[in-house]
From Swiss-Prot:
Its main location: membrane. The chain crosses the membrane at residues 46-66, 89-109, 198-218, 246-266, 272-292, 321-341, 352-372, 381-401, 404-424, 444-464, 469-489. Signal peptide: none annotated. One of its GO terms (cellular component) is membrane. InterPro entries: MFS_assoc_dom, MFS_MFSD6, MFS_trans_sf. Belongs to the major facilitator superfamily. MFSD6 family. This is Major facilitator superfamily domain-containing protein 6-like. The lineage of its organism: Eukaryota, Metazoa, Chordata, Craniata, Vertebrata. The keyword Glycosyltransferase does not apply. It is a multi-pass membrane protein. Keywords: Membrane, Transmembrane, Transmembrane helix. It is found in: Membrane. Coiled coil: none annotated.
Length: 542
């Protein structure tokens, strides 16, 4: 019996579980930081326009919005969480590599870095004519597209016609039904110019990559949360998020240094290879990741319940609108800030350090969040400050004059993001019923990181295509400034409704009772002793 108890206590090792989860999220975030922030730069290198890149990124976010919660539910229902995590790591590491096979359809500002001409660097395009495209005002970059000659297209069609006529009539009839959809697909590709062909292929690969990569985060997070919840240690779960930001900062800085030093040898492929290597290195950590499956099933209407709670609270509705708007602006910044830095002469090392600074400043917000919240006396005012900070950040970006000048704005970006999610977390706790806190917080995350990000990427792509990056950031700053003023007035006018959370009250009462000295007695024991003394005094008197 004693041996079984020892095995059980060894099995539920909370500190070890948190350490393993921290290592896992550090490696995974490090790999993501090596590639995701630089993805739009690589698409620009391929010759895609800003509008095309906006459509690709918007499709990526929309796919995540739909597939992430559904895949998380399926992994839990069939008890395949670890399989999903390992499969997602390996698949995403391999699926992203075909993007390196696409030849560059453009000559960008970095073409003069290695003292070699760009046409010589792309010998795979002998039948192409490089035509310069008009760049919107406000951008210093020159983008080129590649259009195939009509001679090569007509020659290909003639060759296909000869081959088709050489087949027998019976063979044509049998192949017509089988290859008609395939022929229509290839025919539509042949009609497109080289730039649209590139856009269509990149969109397919990116969608497939997102499909295999997106189930990992929620699946791993759910397994750890339920593991800690089983042993009443969910307060340790928030400590894991810090390592996500540290890993992303390390990955961005590392790949910036590597690309800057190895660009003339292997070009932009360093980012992809770094991502693949780190995803594979994360697999052993995922095999040891603590995952627990509850025997009882959760209610399937958790998402609808969270929507009802948000819809029924005016303050929560304001918070939802705010996270959608901030998600739009944050997505636009993440997609096109590096474009602006590249136009100012920045190299990847500048970009990596600036991205790392934003992540580290986000982690540095936690120590001051408590005192700042007590000073403001209401977390809703911190939400207003976050919107104001993001507006100032975008305005600063629009007047960027050198690569290193972005660093003050990156410091402000980390604090603005930290203040935003601190306020959102507090708002989720205010309206949550027991067991719905995490679901409501994820609903706000989906509003911001998926829905808002999709709208922001789509709109930002067309704005940059038409007016330039500077106008994009100025417009985002004006929009956030107007909303921050309206938000402050509405926060002041709308009464605050806070639901009583009995689980938090019980936890607070437990902490208070544990901090009391042993000499102090429970109120029930004191009342019983007083009653006994009163009864004894009455008996003696009689």
């Amino acid at each position: 019996m004693k041996k079984g108890a020892m095995q059980k206590s060894k099995q539920w090792n909370v500190k070890g579980a948190v350490r393993l989860a921290s290592v896992f999220h550090f490696l995974h975030s490090c790999g993501s930081g090596c590639l995701l922030p630089f993805l739009t730069l690589y698409f620009r290198h391929l010759g895609l326009s800003a509008a095309m890149i906006g459509i690709i990124m918007a499709s990526k976010h929309l796919l995540a919005l739909l597939w992430r919660p559904f895949s998380s539910v399926l992994a839990r229902q069939y008890d395949k969480r670890r399989t999903v995590i390992v499969g997602s790591l390996l698949s995403s590491a391999l699926v992203v590599l075909p993007l390196l096979l696409f030849p560059s359809a453009g000559i960008l500002v970095e073409s003069g870095r290695c003292n070699t001409s760009q046409p010589d660097a792309d010998p795979t395009l002998p039948l192409a004519v490089i035509e310069q495209m008009t760049v919107p005002v406000g951008s210093n970059a020159t983008v080129y597209s590649v259009n195939q000659t009509s001679v090569s297209t007509n020659q290909t069609l003639e060759d296909n016609t000869l081959v088709n006529h050489s087949r027998s009539a019976r063979g044509l009839r049998s192949l017509k039904k089988e290859e008609e959809p395939h022929s229509e697909f290839l025919g539509s590709l042949k009609v497109m110019d080289a730039q649209h062909q590139m856009f269509f292929l990149v969109l397919l690969v990116t969608a497939l990559w997102e499909f295999v990569a997106v189930p990992l985060e929620w699946t791993a997070d759910d397994g750890l949360y339920e593991y800690l919840d089983f042993v009443d240690a969910t307060d340790r779960h928030s400590g894991v998020k810090v390592w996500k930001h540290v890993g992303a900062a390390f990955g961005s800085c590392l790949v910036g240094v590597l690309v800057t030093n190895l660009f003339c040898r292997i070009g932009n492929s360093v980012e992809f290879y770094s991502y693949t290597v780190l995803m594979i290195l994360t697999v052993p950590a995922s095999a040891l990741l603590p995952i627990y499956l509850r025997k009882r099933e959760r209610p399937t209407s958790g998402g609808f319940k969270a929507l009802q709670l948000v819809h029924g609270n005016p303050q929560a509705i304001l918070c939802a609108v705010t996270v959608i708007l901030t998600g739009m602006v944050t997505s636009a910044v993440s997609d096109f800030l590096l474009w602006l830095m590249q136009d100012c002469g920045a190299m990847e090392i500048h970009m990596g350090i600036c991205l790392a600074l934003a992540h580290l400043s986000h982690t540095g917000f936690s120590p001051i969040a408590g005192p700042l919240s007590r000073f403001l006396k209401y977390h809703g005012w911190m939400l207003v400050l976050a919107v104001v900070g993001l507006a100032m950040q975008c305005l600063y970006y629009s007047f960027l004059w050198s690569p290193w000048a972005v660093m003050p704005a990156q410091l402000l970006a980390g604090f603005s993001t930290g203040a935003l999610w601190w306020s959102v977390t507090s708002q989720s706790e205010d309206i949550a019923t027991p067991g719905t806190e995490k679901t409501i917080l994820r609903l706000f995350e989906a509003f911001s990181l998926d829905m808002g990000a999709a709208l922001g990427s789509l709109i930002a792509g067309f704005v940059v295509q038409k007016f330039g990056v500077n106008v994009l950031f100025q417009g985002a700053s004006v929009m956030l400034a107007v909303w921050s003023s309206a938000l402050a007035v509405l926060k002041w006018k709308i009464p605050r409704q806070r639901r009583i959370n009995y689980s938090r009250l019980l936890a607070a009462d437990t902490e208070v009772s544990e901090s009391e000295s042993d000499q102090e007695k429970d109120w029930l024991e004191t009342a019983m002793e007083d009653d006994r003394r009163n009864n004894k005094w009455t008996v003696n008197k009689s």
